[in-house]
Amino acid sequence: MQHKLLINGELVSGEGEKQPVYNPATGDVLLEIAEASAEQVDAAVRAADAAFAEWGQTTPKVRAECLLKLADVIEENGQVFAELESRNCGKPLHSAFNDEIPAIVDVFRFFAGAARCLNGLAAGEYLEGHTSMIRRDPLGVVASIAPWNYPLMMAAWKLAPALAAGNCVVLKPSEITPLTALKLAELAKDIFPAGVINVLFGRGKTVGDPLTGHPKVRMVSLTGSIATGEHIISHTAPSIKRTHMELGGKAPVIVFDDADIEAVVEGVRTFGYYNAGQDCTVACRIYAQKGIYDTLVEKLGAAVATLKSGAPDDESTELGPLSSLAHLERVSKAVEEAKATGHIKVITGGEKRKGNGYYYAPTLLAGALQDDAIVQKEVFGPVVSVTLFDNEEQVVNWANDSQYGLASSVWTKDVGRAHRVSARLQYGCTWVNTHFMLVSEMPHGGQKLSGYGKDMSLYGLEDYTVVRHVMVKH
């Protein structure tokens, strides 16, 4: 397994403290990797800053060609990446290979095309004798912090738009799941000029803080927890850096009496438990109208009970383990607190799986109330709650009564209601009669404590640029 850092076009061993990297399906240590030292963090940022002088002036065509080459080598090494992701994250191998690798490749190919379509406003005369032009230019060095739930996917979401816009990047994957990012570094070093992409390894305190606080870093992009986002915003405030935050969610799933119940059950069985629920957009907070509440709970409980947890390399496995022992304990604690309320009923699951690995049973909880912690707080595991509601006004208020604002869905056959409710929901994305679907052409990002800024789409590309005005007197 590739375990070296990429700094200024060279693969080098970390000079800091060694950290274990685990296989969550067994609890065994896969390997130990040395963190980047403070000096190596500084070297990576300075390499990116030096490379920006030339990379920032390249044509969109040149940047697009590099991104397309990177997409091709990821596709060619898809099985290798999927196996690394499966071993390091516990993802079912077939899901990593069939779902995630093609989407990752598409992200790089989309931004390769988008790079050639990013334009400023056409020239115009707004003052006599002067011509004004609007430019969209790269910012410089971007520090990108990727999470542990989709290590390679989130690295792609951050690298592709930043590079397409002409920035240079220092990427720090999570210390829990670094293996695919380090493998990506090995392949990228022969495609991009030295210093354009740098990849480090280490914890937030030892590597993340000196990286995000570095004076030559002009932008920090994070996908992570609210607590981490708060820390980075505070940490970078003295240097007034641009920040781009995707900080989690608690997606409301509003099911009206006229919804197609079979479609809801099929959708939540898939979209509520994908990646063992370790996804900020999962369908985890169901609001079911009183006319279909009992039927939905019964049918969904039966469906969730058929989900198979197992070894990641088993083709029949639908749910792998959680990412770490610490996270398993957090998920377990959240469910135990829900049970202790007395009014929440465990329909299925509700316990750790016996044996090795960090497995938690797919869980459905019914009878949850609006103010319950299981409704208000992100669990980030295979846990879905169901809350009964009376009418449209009530459920819209409840759905919006959340610190999160990332994703939501509405299930109804009434087109007017679908439009009406979607317009009132305070979420970055609202799906109607589906959930969880993402495409490279459409933006992904939240409101409120879910953060700000967009991933994917032309809006995502614009987030990695600065708008400039050039005026010429003639």
Swiss-Prot record:
Enzyme Commission number(s): 1.2.1.19, 1.2.1.-
Pathway(s) annotated for this protein in UniProt: Amine and polyamine degradation; putrescine degradation; 4-aminobutanoate from 4-aminobutanal: step 1/1; Amino-acid degradation
Signal sequence segment: none
EC top class, as a word: oxidoreductase
Catalytic activity: 4-aminobutanal + NAD(+) + H2O = 4-aminobutanoate + NADH + 2 H(+); 5-aminopentanal + NAD(+) + H2O = 5-aminopentanoate + NADH + 2 H(+)
Keywords: NAD, Oxidoreductase
Gene3D superfamilies, A to Z: Aldehyde Dehydrogenase, Chain A, domain 1, Aldehyde Dehydrogenase, Chain A, domain 2
Classification via InterPro entries: Ald_DH/histidinol_DH, Ald_DH_C, Ald_DH_CS_GLU, Ald_DH_N, Aldehyde_DH_dom, Aminobutyraldehyde_DH, PatD
Active site: E246, C280 (nucleophile)
Any one GO molecular-function label of the UniProt entry: NAD binding
GO biological process: one example: L-lysine catabolic process
Binding site for NAD(+): A146, P147, W148, K172, P173, S174, E175, D209, S225, I226, A227, T228, C280
Pfam families the UniProt entry points to: Aldedh (PF00171)
Function: Catalyzes the oxidation 4-aminobutanal (gamma-aminobutyraldehyde) to 4-aminobutanoate (gamma-aminobutyrate or GABA). This is the second step in one of two pathways for putrescine degradation, where putrescine is converted into 4-aminobutanoate via 4-aminobutanal. Also functions as a 5-aminopentanal dehydrogenase in a a L-lysine degradation pathway to succinate that proceeds via cadaverine, glutarate and L-2-hydroxyglutarate.
Family: Belongs to the aldehyde dehydrogenase family. Gamma-aminobutyraldehyde dehydrogenase subfamily.
Comment field (misc): 4-aminobutanal can spontaneously cyclize to 1-pyrroline, and 5-aminopentanal to 1-piperideine.
Self-association state and partner proteins as the record states: Homotetramer.
Protein name: Gamma-aminobutyraldehyde dehydrogenase
Organism: Escherichia coli O157:H7
